[in-house]
Amino acid sequence: MIRQDILKDLKRVVIKIGSSVISNKDKRQSSLECGLSKDWVRHYARQIKLIQDKGYDVVLVSSGAVMAGRERLGLSRAGLSIPEKQACAAIGQSFLMHTYEKAFEKKNMKVAQILLSNDDLGNRRRYLNAKHTIEALLARDVIPIINENDSVTVEEIKIGDNDTLSATVACLVDAQLLIILSDVKGLYN
């Protein structure tokens, strides 16, 4: 299938950004703060602005809260307990959102944070509430930035899987396209 055929009926896209693609790995130290590369976050904000300017709705699913919190506390990745990862997520989430907010603000774009869990998406009432909230944000050209609510989840934080969350969100918002940005070559299972 040709790219134009795929994009012809496109109205809404979900983009999942993995923590590895916004981290400091192989990137300039000058833009680094709490493990996040501000240069890369600004780059993705510019790209999302271009997509939005073409008339597409964009929903962003982002990882990075646990990493940012871990970096902020000066902890290594190895050996963290579930409660420690949850604490890192709680600390890192606000910094992650602040970084996105500043990058999108430079493009005159507004963002909104939505934290979801499998429990939210498995409960019909909460699922519909999330859907309606996202629809209201998109109607106002606000970019919803969704992350797993890692500070209260247990199973999901063990896996660290926002790929599954992004697929569920794509269904939730009736997206025609899901883009997963990751350092994994191919499909990860």
Please annotate each region the language model reported:
Residues 1-189:
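Nucleotide/pyrophosphate-binding catalytic subdomain
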